[in-house]
Amino acid sequence: MAVEKFETALKKLEDVVRKLEGGDLSLDDSLKAFEEGVKMASFCTKKLDEAEKKVELLLKKKDGTFVREDFRLDDE
């Protein structure tokens, strides 16, 4: 995939959604747009997952010191 930046992929995904919601595309063009949207959504999800793994939270303990912890969502 030629897309390298999250922001670029997100913009393309938003454009695809707008086109599909417009209802003016032929069935063939709709399928092509949908396929492109799925690719962009997958790329964005991958980039967000990579970023999440890099994020660390700096938490203040009761004694005033700070501890670093990996970022985790509550459902993990």
UniProtKB/Swiss-Prot annotation:
Reactions the enzyme catalyzes: Exonucleolytic cleavage in either 5'- to 3'- or 3'- to 5'-direction to yield nucleoside 5'-phosphates
Could you list this entry's UniProt keywords, alphabetically sorted: Cytoplasm, Exonuclease, Hydrolase, Nuclease
- Gene Ontology CC entries for this record: cytosol; exodeoxyribonuclease VII complex
- Reported EC number(s) for this entry are 3.1.11.6
Q: Which SUPFAM superfamilies match?
A: XseB-like
Q: Where in the cell is it found?
A: Cytoplasm
What the entry lists under Pfam families is as follows:
Exonuc_VII_S
What name does UniProt use for this protein? Exodeoxyribonuclease 7 small subunit
Q: Which organism is it from?
A: Geobacter sulfurreducens (strain ATCC 51573 / DSM 12127 / PCA)
